[in-house]
């Protein structure tokens, strides 16, 4: 339901599309003549992440899916298919199919990942978690801001109800004398058709009946103002500036996600011996290519 809210859908898709365009690269830090130098390394793991996962998703769709799950549900998961120490493929797993079995102590924490009844160790999965406190669970925007999103969704449904009635005003019928049950039932049917069928927007009242229009509620009168306030609040929770400034958008909405993905890749895709000098990082110069 959250993705039915236009501002939520726009933010999620814009952020996911932006991240999907940025390639990940592998770098190595070397010391030459006493000076530290960073060089780019050609590596098949980058091709798996950027181009072809060797699963059903291409690199772009793979990154989009991860970012959407990360933002909305707080956790994005991908199975790392290895043969010995070589990564052969990456397999996105929908967050709905991931179940965490906890074995936590206050200090020493451990858990397993269950997918379709099969148990996996954490190192077998790429895990990108939002606002995690235990390394196993993340906090998504839907859970973190459920009250705001509920109001936004109800506002959307309220708008739809206004449109479905063709803008017909609410009101009440005043009668100079008592109405028979048959006349009352007929009037109810006609009134129901007036509000349910946009093609039938005319109702004829007898001489003794008079329609009195009800005044607009405060919700109706402040609808546009309320929508603007809600939309701005939704932009805030995604880190999207209300003026849609591109540079600010990259810094506040995109860079934190890139950092989370980089951290996950360095932890889960690098061998222990590689972690001393190798690291994955996004080439953010690609964001402004063509500007």
Give the residues covered by each predicted segment.
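A translation/RNA-centric and nucleic-acid-associated enzymatic feature enriched
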Residues: 261-269
């Amino acid at each position: 339901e959250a993705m039915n809210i236009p501002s939520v859908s726009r933010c999620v898709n814009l952020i996911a599309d932006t991240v999907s365009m940025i390639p990940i690269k592998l770098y190595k830090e070397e010391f030459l003549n006493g000076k530290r130098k960073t060089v780019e390394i050609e590596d098949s793991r980058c091709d798996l992440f950027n181009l072809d996962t060797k699963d059903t998703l291409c690199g772009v769709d793979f990154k989009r899916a991860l970012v959407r799950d990360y933002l909305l549900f707080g956790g994005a998961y991908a199975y790392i298919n290895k043969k010995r120490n070589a990564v052969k493929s990456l397999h996105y797993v929908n967050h709905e199919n991931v179940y965490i079995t906890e074995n936590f102590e206050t200090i020493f924490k451990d858990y397993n990942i269950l997918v379709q009844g099969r148990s996996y160790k954490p190192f077998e999965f790429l895990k990108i978690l939002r606002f995690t406190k235990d390394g196993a669970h993340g906090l998504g925007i839907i859970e973190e801001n459920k009250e705001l999103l509920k109001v936004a969704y109800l506002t959307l449904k309220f708008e739809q109800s206004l449109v479905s009635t063709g803008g017909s005003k609410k009101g009440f019928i005043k009668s100079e004398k008592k109405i028979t049950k048959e006349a009352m039932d007929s009037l109810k049917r006609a009134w129901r058709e007036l509000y349910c069928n946009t093609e039938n927007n005319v109702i004829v009242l007898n001489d003794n009946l008079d329609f009195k229009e009800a005044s607009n509620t405060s919700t109706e009168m402040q609808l546009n103002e309320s929508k603007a306030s809600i939309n701005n609040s939704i932009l805030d929770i995604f880190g999207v500036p209300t003026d849609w400034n591109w540079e600010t958008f990259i810094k506040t909405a995109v860079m934190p996600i890139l950092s989370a993905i980089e951290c996950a890749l360095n932890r889960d895709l690098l061998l222990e011996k590689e972690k001393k000098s190798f690291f994955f990082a996004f080439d953010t110069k690609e964001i402004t290519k063509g500007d």
